[in-house]
Curated annotation (Swiss-Prot):
PANTHER family: 40S RIBOSOMAL PROTEIN S14/30S RIBOSOMAL PROTEIN S11. It comes from Gossypium hirsutum. InterPro entries: Ribosomal_uS11, Ribosomal_uS11_bac-type, Ribosomal_uS11_CS, Ribosomal_uS11_sf. This is Small ribosomal subunit protein uS11c. One of its GO terms (cellular component) is chloroplast. Belongs to the universal ribosomal protein uS11 family. Residues 1-24 are annotated as: Disordered. Keywords: Chloroplast, Plastid, Ribonucleoprotein, Ribosomal protein, RNA-binding, rRNA-binding. GO terms for molecular function: rRNA binding; structural constituent of ribosome. It is found in: Plastid, Chloroplast. GO terms for biological process: translation. Residues 9-24 have a biased composition (Basic residues). Part of the 30S ribosomal subunit.
Amino acid sequence: MAKPIPKVGSRRNGRSSARKSARRIPKGVIHVQASFNNTIVTVTDVRGRVISWSSAGTCGFKGTRRGTPFAAQTAAGNAIRAVVDQGMQRAEVMIKGPGLGRDAALRAIRRSGILLSFVRDVTPMPHNGCRPPKKRRV
């Protein structure tokens, strides 16, 4: 009979050691994507690796409430709370999209105590690219 291969660490108990320990991140980039339906806040380090993220949907808002300014404020607060614990003091903010949550997310970021080096609007603007969808008739 073949000898069983000894398990070094199963998936269940080896999970905690596989997770990276929280490293100190003094400076980062906060990306806010505000669409009409949702607001997504992603916090990365300066190299672009994601540290934390949150959206209005993951904060418990469903349906049309995801696009509200209050939902964006809650999502920004959740994403930033994790990185403040890791020692982030300075950040750059990139805001993308036309949604209602742009200003509310920025206000929540300002209130968190992180110093903002700059705020940049990176909304993609077409130079007469694709034809836009037809206007809604309600």
